[in-house]
């Protein structure tokens, strides 16, 4: 199998400023030291054609940051991502404008993807039908529920037939019938040897759908490998974490966060 996505030593840093004065110092003084947060820290992994990789981890671990970097909407501070093919990201509201109607968003988003108006016109009926939005397709997206936005975003991205698909919690909202229809459609992608990154807290879906697991903890890649090797370890960790009191869970998160802040 060919490598479709090669993530090489990817780090994403955010400078933290408490005041505008700190921000100005950082902009004007060369090599000025300031508090920096490591959203991701030196992550490397390879995805091959046909891989369905579940990105798992507790809230704030860095899963969405990584998915955005894979999708190209976010650039790493250090490192690089090589992609062999077109990438499409499905996340709640990703790339949608609240001021535009659903049908206007279809045209706008597909123009941004590089499609011609003639191609968009031909594909639009299929997108509308898959979305199940009916007359709401002519309403401004700002009036949509999160489930409706997810339906529209998924319908656009699945119809353009990408080589690499990044799904970030897009199936966590909306009705179960639509979610199952989406999964069935994704299975078709899987059979076509496309590469899929699947971000979800629903471990049932992860187990049903994924072939590999990338466990992100505190911005680092804690484990990566075959589903049957990594998922049981993550489930054991998650069960232990859920048994902790709220105070103990908070302490665990705080320790992880503290390790991600440095002065540089």
Curated annotation (Swiss-Prot):
GO CC entries: plasma membrane
Topology term for the membrane: Peripheral membrane protein
Catalytic activity: ATP + H2O + teichoic acidSide 1 = ADP + phosphate + teichoic acidSide 2
Compartments (UniProt record): Cell membrane
Entry EC no(s): 7.5.2.4
UniProt keyword list: ATP-binding, Cell membrane, Membrane, Nucleotide-binding, Translocase, Transport
Domain named ABC transporter: residues: 5-243
Alphabetized InterPro entries for the sequence: AAA+_ATPase, ABC_transporter-like_ATP-bd, ABC_transporter-like_CS, ABC_transpr_TagH-like, Bact_Polysacc_Export_ATP-bd, P-loop_NTPase
Binding annotation for ATP: 57-64
MF-aspect GO terms: ABC-type teichoic acid transporter activity; ATP binding; ATP hydrolysis activity
Matching NCBIfam families: PRK13546.1 (NF010066)
PANTHER family, per the entry: TEICHOIC ACIDS EXPORT ATP-BINDING PROTEIN TAGH (PTHR46743:SF2)
Function: Part of the ABC transporter complex TagGH involved in teichoic acids export. Responsible for energy coupling to the transport system.
Similarity comment: Belongs to the ABC transporter superfamily. Teichoic acids exporter (TC 3.A.1.104.1) family.
Annotated protein name in UniProt: Teichoic acids export ATP-binding protein TagH
């Amino acid at each position: 199998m060919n490598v479709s996505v090669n993530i090489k030593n990817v780090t994403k840093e955010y400078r933290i400023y408490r005041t505008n004065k700190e921000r100005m110092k950082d902009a004007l003084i060369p090599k000025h030291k300031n508090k920096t947060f490591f959203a991701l820290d030196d992550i490397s992994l390879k995805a091959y054609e046909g891989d369905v990789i579940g990105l798992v981890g507790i809230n704030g671990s860095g899963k969405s940051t990584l998915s955005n970097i894979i999708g190209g909407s976010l650039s790493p501070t250090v490192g690089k991502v090589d992609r062999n093919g077109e990438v499409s990201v499905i996340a709640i509201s990703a790339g949608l404008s609240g001021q535009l109607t659903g049908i206007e968003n279809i045209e706008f988003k597909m123009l941004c993807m590089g499609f011609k108006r003639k191609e968009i016109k031909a594909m639009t009926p299929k997108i509308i039908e898959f979305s199940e939005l009916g007359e709401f397709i002519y309403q401004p997206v700002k009036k949509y529920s999160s489930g409706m936005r997810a339906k529209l975003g998924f319908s656009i991205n699945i119809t353009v037939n990408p080589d690499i698909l990044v799904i970030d919690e897009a199936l966590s909202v909306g009705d179960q019938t639509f979610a199952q229809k989406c999964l069935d459609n994704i299975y078709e992608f899987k059979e076509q040897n496309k590469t899929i990154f699947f971000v979800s807290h629903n471990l049932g879906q992860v187990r049903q759908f994924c072939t590999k697991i990338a466990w992100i903890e505190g911005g680092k890649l804690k484990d990566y490998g075959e589903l049957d090797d990594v998922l049981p370890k993550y489930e054991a960790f998650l069960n232990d974490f859920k048994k902790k009191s709220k105070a103990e869970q908070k302490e665990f998160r705080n320790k992880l966060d503290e390790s991600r802040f440095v002065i540089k």
